[in-house]
Design a protein with these regions (language model features):
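A short, glycine/small-residue-rich beta-strand->loop->alpha-helix junction that serves as a flexible
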Residues: 5-18, 124, 192
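A donor-sugar binding/catalytic signature common to diverse glycosyltransferases
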Residues: 93-98, 224-267
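C-terminal amphipathic helix plus adjacent low-complexity
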Residues: 291-326
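Conserved nucleotide-sugar phosphate-binding/catalytic loop shared by glycosyltransferases and other
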Residues: 7-8, 26-75
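Conserved nucleotide-sugar donor-binding subdomain of glycosyltransferases
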Residues: 62-93, 98-103
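A nucleotide-sugar donor-handling region in carbohydrate enzymes
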Residues: 133-192
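Short amphipathic alpha-helix
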Residues: 13-24, 36
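Donor-nucleotide binding loops and adjacent catalytic segments primarily
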Residues: 21, 166-233
Length: 326
């Protein structure tokens, strides 16, 4: 049996874990504080939250960790749950997506750990401790497009899988019912209730069809695949899941990186722009700029195959199984 720790922020970690777990040839138990129900997991253990204290103290343990608030009851219960899982279930390995503290805690209990890396600036001590402790590192992007300096020390145990999309293997579904000139997809990892400039874009471009999907528009759908395949242009942030899904659909994309810890999305945006896979902009385009984007969208054929989404989840699963079988 393999454990799979899934971070609760947003939906990207859950989608990635679900995609990978579906290719693992043994029971996989999810450990998470997120709302996660997926048949690929033999069990989901709900972990206590460790971020409910409005005034957490000494959260980084003097710079050694990222999140270990002093005397936090939620953290204490959470770690006790993980310890009980290891003691009673004896996992062959645990995947951590993502947490420095969980990685180190599990390794201290003698459990082989596979860590999912994220883009950005990860040269700080906590990240490097986790990467050194890991038995393997999964980098869910193409090796030829992004190899940050902070990862070079760990390359011998790093598997670059390509972008992991929940839609890998699905046939394109293009239909007028789902068509839009501009499809704006927002994730669940940002600021809840924050206004989105796309809400007025339809009024500014009455000659075009603008569709918004996500919490910012109150129009979340579980399966945006037909929308992604049918759009002339898709607008996304630079989260790993969003980029992988856009790559799987193969449509032209406008990528607007959002502010995230460790400059995660900025790094991905820079990679996409340098590789000419998407139009990357740091701010919301003007109305005239949108018209220009749409005028050129028809002749745009991004080489999304370079993001290597085909088979990425399966490659991650094989790397996980290799550690579990040692």
């Amino acid at each position: 049996m393999i454990g799979y720790y899934v971070h609760h922020q947003g939906r990207g970690h859950c989608s990635r874990a679900t995609a990978v777990a579906g290719h693992i040839g043994t029971d996989v138990v999810a450990l998470t504080s997120a709302s996660l129900t997926a048949p690929v997991f033999s069990e989901v253990i709900t972990l206590e939250r460790d971020d409910s204290d409005p005034q957490p103290r000494d959260v980084d343990a003097g710079g050694l960790l990222h999140w270990a608030p002093r005397h936090d009851g939620g953290l204490r219960t959470r770690m006790a749950q993980l310890a009980e899982f290891v003691e009673t279930r004896r996992p062959a390995a645990v995947v951590v997506d993502v947490s420095v503290e969980v990685t180190l805690f599990l390794r201290l209990m003698g459990v082989p750990v596979i860590v999912t890396a994220q883009p950005g600036v990860r040269d700080d001590l906590p990240h490097q401790l986790a990467y050194r402790a890991a038995d393997a590192i999964i980098a869910p992007w193409p090796a030829e497009l992004y190899q940050p300096d902070w990862l070079r020390e760990h390359l011998p145990k790093t598997v670059f899988t390509g972008g992991i999309s929940r839609f890998d293997g699905r046939l394109p579904v293009s239909h007028p019912t789902f068509a839009a000139d501009i499809l704006v997809v927002t994730g669940a990892g940002g600021v809840p209730g924050a206004p989105h400039p796309a809400t007025t874009l339809g009024e500014e471009l009455p000659e075009h069809t603008v569709v918004g999907l996500g919490p910012a528009f109150g129009t979340w759908v579980d399966d945006p695949w037909p929308f992604l395949c049918s759009a002339r242009v898709t607008v996304i942030g630079a989260g790993q899941g969003s980029v992988a899904d856009a790559a799987a659909a193969g449509r032209p994309a406008v990528v607007i990186p959002e502010d995230r810890p460790f400059a995660e999305q900025r790094a991905t945006g820079t990679t996409l722009a340098r590789s000419e896979l998407a139009l990357v902009t740091s701010s919301w385009p003007s109305t005239e700029r949108w018209r220009s984007i749409l005028d050129t969208a028809g002749s745009s054929s991004p080489e999304w195959s370079r993001w290597h989404t085909a088979g990425a989840a399966e490659r991650a699963a094989r790397a996980i199984e290799a550690v579990a079988h040692r």
